[in-house]
Amino acid sequence: MNNSEFSKIAETVIAHIADRIEEQNQDIDVDLQSDILSIDTTDGIYVINKQSAAKEIWLSSPVSGPYHFFYEQGKWKNRAGLELMSILTDELGIDF
Protein backbone atom coordinates (compact mmCIF):
# COMPACT_ATOMS: atom_id res chain seq x y z
CA MET A 1 0.00 0.00 0.00
CA ASN A 2 1.41 3.39 -0.90
CA ASN A 3 1.27 6.48 1.33
CA SER A 4 -1.75 7.95 -0.43
CA GLU A 5 -3.77 4.74 -0.06
CA PHE A 6 -2.76 4.44 3.59
CA SER A 7 -3.78 8.04 4.33
CA LYS A 8 -7.18 7.60 2.71
CA ILE A 9 -7.93 4.34 4.55
CA ALA A 10 -6.66 5.63 7.91
CA GLU A 11 -8.50 8.96 7.67
CA THR A 12 -11.71 7.17 6.72
CA VAL A 13 -11.60 4.79 9.69
CA ILE A 14 -10.72 7.56 12.17
CA ALA A 15 -13.63 9.68 10.91
CA HIS A 16 -15.92 6.61 11.09
CA ILE A 17 -14.95 6.05 14.73
CA ALA A 18 -15.75 9.68 15.56
CA ASP A 19 -19.09 9.53 13.75
CA ARG A 20 -20.20 6.28 15.42
CA ILE A 21 -19.37 7.57 18.89
CA GLU A 22 -21.28 10.80 18.27
CA GLU A 23 -24.27 8.82 16.96
CA GLN A 24 -24.40 6.33 19.82
CA ASN A 25 -23.26 8.17 22.94
CA GLN A 26 -23.91 11.84 23.52
CA ASP A 27 -22.09 11.71 26.88
CA ILE A 28 -18.70 11.11 25.25
CA ASP A 29 -16.91 14.21 23.94
CA VAL A 30 -15.27 13.66 20.55
CA ASP A 31 -12.79 16.04 18.90
CA LEU A 32 -11.29 15.29 15.47
CA GLN A 33 -8.60 17.68 14.26
CA SER A 34 -5.83 17.05 11.72
CA ASP A 35 -6.34 13.26 11.79
CA ILE A 36 -6.03 13.17 15.59
CA LEU A 37 -9.14 11.94 17.37
CA SER A 38 -9.55 12.69 21.07
CA ILE A 39 -12.30 10.84 22.92
CA ASP A 40 -13.03 12.19 26.40
CA THR A 41 -14.77 9.64 28.63
CA THR A 42 -15.31 9.17 32.36
CA ASP A 43 -12.34 6.75 32.28
CA GLY A 44 -10.04 9.35 30.74
CA ILE A 45 -9.00 10.51 27.29
CA TYR A 46 -8.41 8.19 24.36
CA VAL A 47 -6.25 9.42 21.49
CA ILE A 48 -6.30 7.83 18.04
CA ASN A 49 -4.05 9.04 15.25
CA LYS A 50 -2.38 7.89 12.08
CA GLN A 51 1.36 7.41 11.84
CA SER A 52 2.10 7.77 8.13
CA ALA A 53 5.78 6.81 8.27
CA ALA A 54 4.97 3.47 9.92
CA LYS A 55 1.63 3.09 8.08
CA GLU A 56 -0.07 2.46 11.41
CA ILE A 57 -2.91 3.79 13.50
CA TRP A 58 -1.96 4.38 17.10
CA LEU A 59 -4.36 4.19 20.03
CA SER A 60 -3.67 5.49 23.50
CA SER A 61 -6.27 4.08 25.89
CA PRO A 62 -6.67 5.21 29.51
CA VAL A 63 -8.02 1.73 30.25
CA SER A 64 -5.63 -0.66 28.49
CA GLY A 65 -2.66 1.44 27.40
CA PRO A 66 -1.01 2.07 24.02
CA TYR A 67 -1.44 0.07 20.83
CA HIS A 68 -0.09 0.19 17.27
CA PHE A 69 -2.30 -1.21 14.50
CA PHE A 70 -1.46 -2.13 10.91
CA TYR A 71 -3.94 -2.66 8.08
CA GLU A 72 -4.38 -6.26 6.99
CA GLN A 73 -7.20 -7.83 4.98
CA GLY A 74 -9.61 -4.98 5.67
CA LYS A 75 -8.95 -4.79 9.43
CA TRP A 76 -6.68 -2.81 11.73
CA LYS A 77 -4.78 -5.33 13.89
CA ASN A 78 -1.86 -5.22 16.28
CA ARG A 79 0.94 -7.79 16.44
CA ALA A 80 -0.99 -9.85 18.99
CA GLY A 81 -3.93 -10.06 16.58
CA LEU A 82 -6.22 -7.71 18.53
CA GLU A 83 -8.43 -5.52 16.35
CA LEU A 84 -8.79 -1.78 16.83
CA MET A 85 -12.58 -1.88 16.55
CA SER A 86 -12.88 -4.75 19.03
CA ILE A 87 -10.85 -2.92 21.65
CA LEU A 88 -12.91 0.25 21.20
CA THR A 89 -16.18 -1.71 21.34
CA ASP A 90 -15.12 -3.47 24.55
CA GLU A 91 -13.93 -0.30 26.27
CA LEU A 92 -16.46 2.25 25.01
CA GLY A 93 -19.54 0.08 24.54
CA ILE A 94 -20.01 1.40 21.00
CA ASP A 95 -20.84 -0.79 17.99
CA PHE A 96 -18.53 -0.06 15.09
Curated annotation (Swiss-Prot):
Gene Ontology annotations of biological process type? intracellular iron ion homeostasis; iron-sulfur cluster assembly
Q: Which domain of life is it from?
A: Bacteria
The terms describing its cellular component in GO are: cytoplasm
Keywords assigned = Iron, Metal-binding
Q: Which SUPFAM superfamilies match?
A: Frataxin/Nqo15-like
InterPro entries on file? CyaY (IPR047584), Frataxin/CyaY (IPR002908), Frataxin/CyaY_sf (IPR036524), Frataxin_CS (IPR020895)
**A molecular function (GO) term:** ferroxidase activity
Family that this chain belongs to: Belongs to the frataxin family.
PANTHER family, alphabetically?
FRATAXIN (PTHR16821), FRATAXIN, MITOCHONDRIAL (PTHR16821:SF2)
Q: Which NCBIfam families match?
A: FeS_CyaY
Question: What exactly does this protein do?
Answer: Involved in iron-sulfur (Fe-S) cluster assembly. May act as a regulator of Fe-S biogenesis.
Q: What is this protein called?
A: Iron-sulfur cluster assembly protein CyaY
Q: Which organism is it from?
A: Rickettsia bellii (strain RML369-C)
